Structure formats: C-alpha cells, structure tokens
C-alpha cells in the first residue's frame, strides 16, 4: 500500500481509524418492500346498510320485573285523560271509605304526636325559664347581701375613726393635732 504522491495523509490502516464514520456510511441496508397503504374510504350516509335501522330487542314485562301499576281498570271507572299515572282506582265506595279512614287516622295520629311534642317542648322551655329566673334572683340576693355587708363595715370603721378623732382633738391643743394625723418628716434647706 503505497501512499499517493503529494498526499500528506497516512496510508493504510491509519486512515480507517481516523475516519470510522465515512466507512460506515457506505454500507447500505436493503429496504424491505412494503405494499402502499390502502385508503379506507368511509361509507356514505345514504348507503343502504347505514339507512337500515337495526331492530332493538324488546323485553317482556316479566324479564324487566317492573311492578304492575294500574293493571286492571275496574268496570264503570273511566280513566281521566291527562292525569298522573299511578293512581289507585277503587271499584266500591266502602273500600274507598275504609282507605280514607285509615289514612285520616294515620294523619291524625301524626298531628297528635306533633302536638304532644310541642307541648312537651313548651313545658321544658317553661321549666328552663323558671330555673333561669330563680338563678337571677339568687344572684341579686347575694349581691344585695354583699353590698349591705360592705356598707356595715364602712359604717363601723367610720364610727370608730370619728370617736378616736374627737378624743384626740379634745385632749390635745390645736397645734399638736396636726402632728398626730401622721408622722411627717420635714426637711428644711438653709
């Protein structure tokens, strides 16, 4: 492996080491032949298969387990149109009267129980109010007693002070009474 004249590059194995990418880029892989992608066309809405409505399965009442309401309309009773569903029709007046009596009795019982509860609550409120009033009266009495006791103490102290003052003023002359009020130290500056 002779080097080309005028070339400064090293020859042989050294050139491969310096350019590893150039040798790798020359190697080409065989591209796998793939068929071209097929276009999926959406069917028009007017096509017969889309226009045809599919039959939905209809369930029987037994399969659905629905409660039976107004299954039989009694003879002589005409259902008024436009009224709510779920009404119970009674074929005889006696049955209707018994049902009404039962419902009224229940309602009256509920009303009575409500009245009883209201009475009980009112009694409880009244008792609480009386207790609160009694507590307030006790507080007032206690306050009045303490006030009276304080007044009595003041009177006792005042009486004893007045007695002692009169005694001291009567026995001592006027000049010495000022000294007896309190021991004051006086400082005079010359």
Swiss-Prot record:
Q: Where is this chain's protein located in or outside the cell?
A: Nucleus, Nucleolus
The superkingdom listed in its UniProt entry is Eukaryota
InterPro entries reported in the protein's UniProt record: Loc1
Q: Which residues form a coiled coil?
A: 103-159
The answer, when asked if Magnesium is one of the entry's keywords, is no
Q: Where is the composition biased (Basic and acidic residues)?
A: 36-46, 127-148
The annotated regions of Basic residues compositional bias extend over: 180-190
Q: Name one GO cellular component term.
A: nucleolus
One annotated GO biological process: mRNA transport
Keywords carried by this UniProt record = Coiled coil, mRNA transport, Nucleus, Ribosome biogenesis, Transport
Region Disordered, annotated ranges: 1-67, 127-190
Molecular-function annotations in GO: mRNA binding
Subunit and partners? Component of the 66S pre-ribosomal particle.
Q: Which family does it belong to?
A: Belongs to the LOC1 family.
PANTHER family membership: 60S RIBOSOMAL SUBUNIT ASSEMBLY/EXPORT PROTEIN LOC1 (PTHR28028), 60S RIBOSOMAL SUBUNIT ASSEMBLY_EXPORT PROTEIN LOC1 (PTHR28028:SF1)
- Known function: Required for efficient assembly and nuclear export of the 60S ribosomal subunit.
**Can you say what this protein is called?**
60S ribosomal subunit assembly/export protein loc1
Q: Give the source species.
A: Aspergillus oryzae (strain ATCC 42149 / RIB 40) (Yellow koji mold)
Q: What is the lineage of its organism?
A: Eukaryota, Fungi, Dikarya, Ascomycota, Pezizomycotina
């Amino acid at each position: 492996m002779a080097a080309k004249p005028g070339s400064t590059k090293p020859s042989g194995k050294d050139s491969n080491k310096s350019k590893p990418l150039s040798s790798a880029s020359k190697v080409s892989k065989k591209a796998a032949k793939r068929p071209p992608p097929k276009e999926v066309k959406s069917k028009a809405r007017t096509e017969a298969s889309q226009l045809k409505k599919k039959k939905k399965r209809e369930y029987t009442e037994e399969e659905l387990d629905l409660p039976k309401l107004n299954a039989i309309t009694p003879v002589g009773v005409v259902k008024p149109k436009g009224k709510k569903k779920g009404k119970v029709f009674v074929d005889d007046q006696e049955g209707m009267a018994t049902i009404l009596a039962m419902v009224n009795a229940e309602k009256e019982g509920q009303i009575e129980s409500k009245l009883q509860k209201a009475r009980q609550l009112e009694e409880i409120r009244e008792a609480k109010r009386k207790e609160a009033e009694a507590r307030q009266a006790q507080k007032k009495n206690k306050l009045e007693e303490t006030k009276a006791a304080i007044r009595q103490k003041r009177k006792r102290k005042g009486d004893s002070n007045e007695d002692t003052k009169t005694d001291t003023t009567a026995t001592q002359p006027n000049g010495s009474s000022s000294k007896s009020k309190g021991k004051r130290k006086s400082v005079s500056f010359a």
